[in-house]
Amino acid sequence: STHLQGQLVAVHPAYDDAFDGFAAPEVRGNPQARQEWAVNQLFMAAQASQHLGLIAHATFSGALAWPYMYPWPQRPAGLVETAFDELAKRWTPILNAFEDAGVDVCYEIHPGEDLHDGVTFEMLLERTGNHPRCRMLYDPSHYVLQALDYLEHIDIYHDMIKIFHVKDAEFNPTGRQGVYGGYQSWVNRAGRFRSLGDGQVDFQGIFSKMAQYDFPGWAVLELSLIHI
């Protein structure tokens, strides 16, 4: 996977300092050099995936529009569209490299990324001309935390899902906080990750859906333990 490198393909300036540590030391503090380094890392990842005999590769999309996720203050007309146009421009050469390698690029649908739900995935897919290597990594824990119907999501996108993370989570909103979490630590958030079986994800339903649609990939266990 290239989650950190994919993140650096598209970084909004507001996050420059936070993400700079993901890059090689020689390109830190230089956003353009950092992006070029990240893109080159993805090109090499395409070749490495091919050599390893992989058919799917996991990554993040990065984010140019995420700081404007909530529509207040009112977003300037065309801002989101411009951001996704640029995102597609940056990713299309990478997708082409993975096409040459015979490997799918599976974007983990994740908060903090411009691709954080089905709609935003479609926005990039359309701008890449429905690129045959633009695909999805399904992780239900990230959908629980935003109250998205993760079972219907499989019905809609089963043809796009090529990697599956088995990760549990819970969402327990109160009269004091909800989806946004009130800037609290992970332990004190309404939505948080849990050990497999300790959360609210209906894995029986998910595996039934995956079997129904003959999912061809692995079910990869991911643990993000919150000690409570």
Language model regions located:
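Short, solvent-exposed beta-strand-terminating loops
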Residues: 1-13, 61-65, 166-178
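Active-site acidic/histidine proton-transfer and metal-coordination neighborhood
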Residues: 9-135
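Short amphipathic alpha-helices and their capping/turn segments at secondary-structure boundaries
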Residues: 41-56, 149-162, 204-212
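Conserved beta-strand positions in the central sheet of alpha/beta enzyme cores
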Residues: 58, 162-165, 220
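Acidic/histidine-rich catalytic cores of soluble enzymes
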Residues: 80-200
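Short glycine/proline-rich, acidic loop/turn segments that cap or connect secondary-structure elements
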Residues: 181-184, 205-218
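Short acidic/histidine-rich active-site segments
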Residues: 218-224
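Conserved small/polar residues in nucleotide/adenosyl-binding loops
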Residues: 226-228
